[in-house]
């Protein structure tokens, strides 16, 4: 496949862009693959990519019941950060953030990574103490964060109301290397790279069953026929429990809707990501000028990709007190995705009771920011049976009580 470059853009401009190749192939499924990855979102595609790049396993199929990146990867608010409290969390998220820095060059695809900085506002004494604790922990974890006072917060975000009577800003945790990336580009870049390595991307192919023999996986049944495999990676976010049920085991997760919405485009107003966990809201500005706003999960289990209007009202009302200038903006569109929540708000990257089946799920509200690190660790787990990054995120922790409590760092998810 031809590499993208400024010279390729110039060449295609001269011939009216008629010579671009398809970014990825759409082949018919083969009878057997060494590894089948179910889920062509960011995590599934990254897993396949690092299986090929790092471990040399290229006889891989990525199966997607819909279209590539049509799940949570294309429905999130694109925030990237690694300022987590617990050591295992900080390690995998910082690995992801560092991979994002060079991902455009690695994939030869511009993922539009923008390390614009990220603020987590402390709007109560409790939050202030908690964020200072996180800063101290991050310093020990080699994650660059620092505490800043209200005056510096106001300097970074002039439109912020730091002296509101209900939600005063007492300071903020700042991660200057945090930021955003283009979610579609991340999925498309990984898909293109996987296809270039000879992997098969099977869209509109629903898995209807998992076949096992003697306690080991041997293949899957799909809407396009049966496919044999040596190993199976389940990477389907909110539908992980459905696939696990097909294989005969249960997962300690629950699925909920998480939604986001954007305003009409306005001139550049805010050039950092701002998270206000006390009011369950966060906001950034897109390249097109839209204010991208996210809120909390619905308070009940569901598989709706719409969310509920009361969350829009509650979050917007609280953010207006924090950012009064946005009160007259119109909402342009709203959408939702299905997030998979664990009890300790940390992910699951693990072997399963069925030999040869691996699961990557439970990322909750933090899935997009973890894509490269998650894929790197999952690929190592599938290829070698063990990954240092994934070791503490196994299913065993729920049986043994070795929880990785990230209910505070997860922000809007607790």
Swiss-Prot record:
Gene3D superfamilies: D-Amino Acid Oxidase, subunit A, domain 2 (3.30.9.10), FAD/NAD(P)-binding domain (3.50.50.60). It comes from the Bacteria. GO terms for molecular function: nucleotide binding; sarcosine oxidase activity. Coiled coil: none annotated. Its EC number is 1.5.3.24. FAD binds at residues 42-43, 64, 72, 77, 79, 207, 364, 367, 369. Binds 1 FAD per subunit. The keyword Oxidoreductase applies. SUPFAM superfamilies: FAD/NAD(P)-binding domain (SSF51905). Keywords: Cytoplasm, FAD, Flavoprotein, FMN, Nucleotide-binding, Oxidoreductase. It is found in: Cytoplasm. Belongs to the SoxB family. In the presence of tetrahydrofolate, catalyzes the oxidative demethylation of sarcosine to yield glycine, 5,10-methylenetetrahydrofolate and hydrogen peroxide. In the absence of tetrahydrofolate, catalyzes the oxidative demethylation of sarcosine to yield glycine, formaldehyde and hydrogen peroxide. This is Sarcosine oxidase subunit beta. It comes from Rhodobacter capsulatus (strain ATCC BAA-309 / NBRC 16581 / SB1003).
């Amino acid at each position: 496949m031809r590499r993208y470059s400024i010279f390729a853009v110039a060449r295609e401009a001269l011939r009216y862009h008629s010579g671009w190749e398809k970014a990825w192939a759409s082949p018919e499924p083969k009878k057997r693959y060494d590894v089948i990855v179910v889920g062509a979102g960011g995590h599934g595609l990254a897993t396949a990519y690092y299986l090929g790049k790092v471990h040399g396993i290229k006889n891989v199929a990525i199966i997607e019941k819909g279209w590539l990146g049509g799940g949570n990867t294309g429905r999130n608010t694109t925030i990237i950060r690694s300022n987590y409290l617990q050591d295992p969390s900080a390690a995998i998220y910082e690995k992801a953030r560092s991979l994002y820095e060079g991902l455009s060059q690695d994939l030869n695809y511009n993922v539009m990574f923008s390390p614009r900085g990220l603020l987590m506002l402390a709007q109560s004494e409790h939050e202030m103490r908690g964020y200072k604790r996180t800063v101290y922990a991050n310093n020990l974890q080699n994650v660059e964060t620092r505490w800043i006072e209200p005056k510096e917060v106001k300097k970074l975000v002039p439109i912020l109301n730091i002296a509101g009577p209900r939600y005063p800003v007492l300071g903020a945790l700042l991660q200057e290397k945090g930021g955003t990336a283009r979610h579609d580009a991340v999925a498309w870049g990984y898909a293109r790279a996987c296809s270039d390595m000879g992997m098969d991307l099977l869209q509109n192919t629903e898995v209807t069953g998992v076949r096992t023999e003697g306690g080991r996986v041997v293949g899957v049944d799909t809407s396009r026929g049966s496919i044999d495999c040596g190993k199976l990676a389940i990477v389907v976010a909110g539908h992980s429990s459905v696939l696990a049920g097909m294989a005969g085991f249960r997962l300690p997760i629950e699925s909920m809707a998480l939604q986001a919405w954007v305003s009409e485009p306005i001139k550049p107003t805010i050039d950092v990501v701002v998270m206000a966990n006390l009011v369950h809201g966060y906001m950034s500005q897109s390249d097109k000028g839209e204010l991208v706003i996210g809120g909390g999960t619905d308070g009940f289990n569901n598989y709706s990709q719409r969310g509920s209007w009361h969350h829009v009202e509650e979050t917007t009302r609280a953010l207006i007190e924090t950012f009064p200038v946005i009160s007259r903006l119109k909402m342009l569109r709203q959408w939702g995705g299905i997030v998979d929540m664990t009890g300790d708000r940390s992910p699951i990257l693990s072997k399963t009771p069925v030999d040869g089946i691996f699961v990557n799920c439970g990322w909750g509200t933090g899935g997009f920011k973890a894509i490269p690190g998650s894929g790197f660790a999952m690929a190592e787990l599938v290829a070698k049976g063990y990954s240092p990054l994934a070791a503490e995120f196994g299913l065993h922790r729920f049986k043994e009580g070795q929880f990785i409590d990230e209910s505070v760092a997860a922000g809007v998810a607790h």
